[in-house]
Structure formats: C-alpha cells, structure tokens
C-alpha cells in the first residue's frame, strides 16, 4: 500500500472539492417549495421566476406574482417615456396591502426592495417580509412614477 503523502492528500481533496459544485447544482434549480421544475419554454418557474405567493405576514397582506410585459409599472417604462420597460424585478411584482413594493433582482439572483435596498434576500417573498419588518406598522406609500 502506498504511503499517504501531502501531494496525494491535496490531490484527493481537490478531486472531492471539484465534485461538490456538481452535486449542489441541481438543488439550485428548485423553486420556493423545494420542487424541481421542468425546463419547459414559457414556464415562469423554469425560467427562474419565483413562485407566486399570497399570505398575511405580521398582520399585513403580502403578495407576489409574475407580470406580463404589458402590465409593467410607469406605463410600460421608466417615467412613461419607454425607457427601461417593465418591472425591475424581471417580470415579477410584489405588493404590501395592495400597494406595489418595487423589487429588483440582482445579477447574483438575490432580491432587494425600495424599502430594504441594502439588505439583499433570496426571494421576493423574503423581500416583502423584510419590508414589513422595516416599515414597523407604517403604511407603504406608492412609489412616484417620475
């Protein structure tokens, strides 16, 4: 039996470390309920869009759902001038007590809102909950369109 050397130990560790991301990758494709979604064109969950939600959190109704391009805020673009187009949340809208909470999906897949802009979270549901926590009972005011 060959003697265990530092070189062989480091080589074995590198092989194991290289395999870990391959095992973790399929888990990253699960939606909010932990179920894997089929890769079907037009399926919002398959394209990375989070699942819709509608719940009462700390006495506030929070909702989230996908939106179509025609239903974007600000008349289809930033300030109604056609610039930007659609939601910053990549076709996803979040509401607190019926008032839209502006959310944005970051390049790394995390989400931020206009209320908790410097605290990224994993899902729009978590962004809505963080906003309710930050509001501390105050009413969410509509975001100005210009």
From Swiss-Prot:
Residues 1-30 form the signal peptide. Residues 69-85 have a biased composition (Gly residues). Pfam families: MelC1 (PF06236). Predicted to be exported by the Tat system. The position of the signal peptide cleavage has not been experimentally proven. The keyword Nucleus does not apply. One of its GO terms (molecular function) is copper ion binding. GO terms for biological process: melanin biosynthetic process. Gene3D superfamilies: protein ne1242 domain like. PROSITE patterns: TAT. Residues 65-85 are annotated as: Disordered. This protein may function to deliver copper to tyrosinase. Belongs to the melC1 family. This is Tyrosinase cofactor.
């Amino acid at each position: 039996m060959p003697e265990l050397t530092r070189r062989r130990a480091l080589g074995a560790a590198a092989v194991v470390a290289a395999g870990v991301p391959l095992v973790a990758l399929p888990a990253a494709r699960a939606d909010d309920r932990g179920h894997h979604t089929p890769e079907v064109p037009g399926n919002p969950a398959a394209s990375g869009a989070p699942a819709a939600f509608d719940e009462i959190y700390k006495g506030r109704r929070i909702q989230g759902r996908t939106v179509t391009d025609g239903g974007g805020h600000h008349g289809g673009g930033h300030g109604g001038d056609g610039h930007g187009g659609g939601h910053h949340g990549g076709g996803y809208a979040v509401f607190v007590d019926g008032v839209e909470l502006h959310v944005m999906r970051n390049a790394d897949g995390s989400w931020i809102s206009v209320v908790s802009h410097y605290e990224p979270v994993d899902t729009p549901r978590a962004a809505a909950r963080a906003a309710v926590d930050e509001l501390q009972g105050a009413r969410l005011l509509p975001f100005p369109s210009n």
